[in-house]
Amino acid sequence: MGFDVLLDQVGGMGRFQICLIAFFCITNILLFPNIVLENFTAFTPSHRCWVPLLDNDTVSDNDTGTLSKDDLLRISIPLDSNLRPQKCQRFIHPQWQLLHLNGTFPNTNEPDTEPCVDGWVYDRSSFLSTIVTEWDLVCESQSLKSMVQSLFMAGSLLGGLIYGHLSDRVGRKIICKLCFLQLAISNTCAAFAPTFLVYCILRFLAGFSTMTILGNTFILSLEWTLPRSRSMTIMVLLCSYSVGQMLLGGLAFAIQDWHILQLTVSTPIIVLFLSSWKMVESARWLIINNQLDEGLKELRRVAHINGKKNTEETLTTELVRSTMKKELDAVRIKTSIFSLFRAPKLRMRVFGLCFVRFAITVPFYGLILNLQHLGSNVSLFQILCGAVTFTARCVSLLTLNHMGRRISQILFTFPVGLFILVNTFLPQEMQILRVVLATLGIGSVSAASNSASVHHNELVPTILRSTVAGINAVSGRTGAALAPLLMTLMAYSPHLPWISYGVFPILAVPVILLLPETRDLPLPNTIQDVENDRKDSRNIKQEDTCMKVTQF
């Protein structure tokens, strides 16, 4: 396309692109922990009812005699089916007779129990405090924990829809700066939230901006790189997510108070906000939106940074206008979100992309937001997941470049469902195998997400890329919001949530097959580019063949 010619002249992968991608990698490393922060700040420790004989400091040794703590626990808390103290019930009166019984007593003589009316006692060996221990999000209130995660994802859903559209209207740069500021304020204030309601509101606002920033880093990186470098760029950005996962695991291991952990994750965002003033706007977006002078200014700036002094001097408005004449003529037709529904090929692409994003996102967040269900040491498992996803994303780069976008997605998406479904029906005693399958599932879904991100951004035109990304993000974040809510199905069957996580990626496979291949093709700039994709692709392939022949 026209802009790729200009970008090749100023440097498609030079010092500027390296610095840009490095900044976005740092951004992703510092922002991604915000998405899975509730793995630690909302960790649910072992707990039991508060009972006077055990936990009341005013009760003297004379009242309990020489009874051990285990004996006092036995007469105060009933046992569950696994012969462990129940988490949500206690005896109304101490059952002294249990000290003299080796087994259980008949059902007709079962003593009366009551809920934990005086609160709970928590095991603080893993974390000194979490939002669960601070606001007692256990027993009847345990669903509120999932609600926090869903509110964050709901915020990201609305943020992607609103900010995605605004990014196409006012530019990527200004929206990024606004989101950095919003995230820095809301996430920092969340550490000092006086009530659970205030905390939920602040996390909703944090979600509103987090995913928008991450999405815009992808878009800006894509719009400043050439097709031959695009897969590598996306892979590097996604690998930075994995580094962020490992960073959070290390921080959570060292910091056991949720307030301090929240602040530690939030304060670096202030530095990112200050640094964002040095960001460049997408010249591709500026030119497509008839801001030729600003676009030319950015291109000259990039040429200067990349050491292309001759190109910097020869770049003129006339050159830009003539090179991108086709695109500029096409965008004179006013486009809006409704243009998607008037273009049949683009419409079908968007529908397909939305379903694939939804189907991959549900198991992705279902796994990474519920690490507590997969392993006992959450911090270690978080670091392990980061290392596995990093490796998986590197592997996906090879498949993207050698097998194409569609085959790469299918190669990783289908096994996700298989790993989860097999893991669902394994007995709890096979802990090592369960952890191995869960880890493979997380690696596969990360590689599938990597392949999908590359493919999705290459299928939509520049003029509507952020808008489509916002719509696509809505379906993805609907899946992200649904993932923690599906865990409430455990009240009916412990297998139901995991069966749901396993079925969705399998259903995505036939949809992926319907999407066109985009490997080594230039980014479409207009709706007409998408509607004429077959003709343009055939011409490009013919040009590539001619180039290969003339090289010998």
UniProtKB/Swiss-Prot annotation:
Per the record's keyword annotation, is Protease included, yes or no? no
The protein's matches in InterPro entries, at most eight in alphabetical order, are given as:
MFS_dom, MFS_sugar_transport-like, MFS_trans_sf
GO cellular component terms given for this protein: plasma membrane
Q: What GO molecular function annotations does the UniProt record carry, in alphabetical order?
A: transmembrane transporter activity
User: Is Transport included in the keywords of this UniProt record?
Assistant: yes
Q: Which domain of life is it from?
A: Eukaryota
| Protein activity control | Transport is chloride sensitive and transtimulated by glutaric acid. Transport is inhibited by anionic compounds from different chemical classes.
Pfam families per the UniProt record, alphabetical? Sugar_tr (PF00083)
Listed A to Z, the keywords are:
Cell membrane, Ion transport, Lipid metabolism, Lipid transport, Membrane, Steroid metabolism, Transmembrane, Transmembrane helix, Transport
Cysteine disulfide links: none
What are the recorded Gene Ontology BP terms?
monoatomic ion transport; organic anion transport; steroid metabolic process; sterol transmembrane transport
Q: What SUPFAM superfamilies does this protein map onto? A: MFS general substrate transporter
Q: Where are the transmembrane segments?
A: 16-36, 146-166, 178-200, 204-226, 234-254, 260-280, 350-370, 380-400, 407-427, 435-455, 474-492, 496-516
Annotated family: Belongs to the major facilitator (TC 2.A.1) superfamily. Organic cation transporter (TC 2.A.1.19) family.
| Chain's role | Renal transmembrane organic anion/dicarboxylate exchanger that participates in the reabsorption of conjugated steroids including estradiol-17beta-D-glucuronide (or 17beta-estradiol 17-O-(beta-D-glucuronate)), androstanediol glucuronide (or 5alpha-androstane-3alpha,17beta-diol 3-O-(beta-D-glucuronate)), and estrone 3-sulfate, as well as bile acids taurocholate and glycocholate, driven by an outward gradient of dicarboxylates such as glutarate or succinate.
Q: What is this protein called?
A: Steroid transmembrane transporter SLC22A24
Task: Specify the species.
Answer: Homo sapiens (Human)
Native organism taxonomy = Eukaryota, Metazoa, Chordata, Craniata, Vertebrata
As recorded in Swiss-Prot or TrEMBL, the protein's gene is named SLC22A24
